[in-house]
Amino acid sequence: AAPVEFTVEKGSDEKNLALSIKYNKEGDSMAEVELKEHGSNEWLALKKNGDGVWEIKSDKPLKGPFNFRFVSEKGMRNVFDDVVPADFKVGTTYKPE
């Protein structure tokens, strides 16, 4: 299993996605996280807020399921496809297959 979990946080809706990302790698953490909407070729950067939650805010509804790409502090790169579904629920944790 992948060493990462995505939990949808409060404030998430059709235009906003807020995620707690748990990365289970000793001594390493997320440096950059990007999201790609369903049917898109464009990666969009998430910003980390003061609470350690990664957020993306959009002017128009986001289209899931969502793919994620990240770079860790130690330079580990990974892409996870279709992790968070279009009908995500706040408080639910999603893990890549």
UniProtKB/Swiss-Prot annotation:
It is found in: Secreted. Transmembrane segments: none annotated. InterPro entries: Allergen_Lolp2, Expansin_CBD, Expansin_CBD_sf. The keyword Secreted applies. GO terms for biological process: plant-type cell wall loosening. It comes from the Eukaryota. It holds the Pfam family Expansin_C. One of its GO terms (cellular component) is extracellular region. Residues 15-96 form the Expansin-like CBD domain. Keywords: Allergen, Secreted. Belongs to the expansin family. Expansin B subfamily. This is Pollen allergen Lol p 2-A.
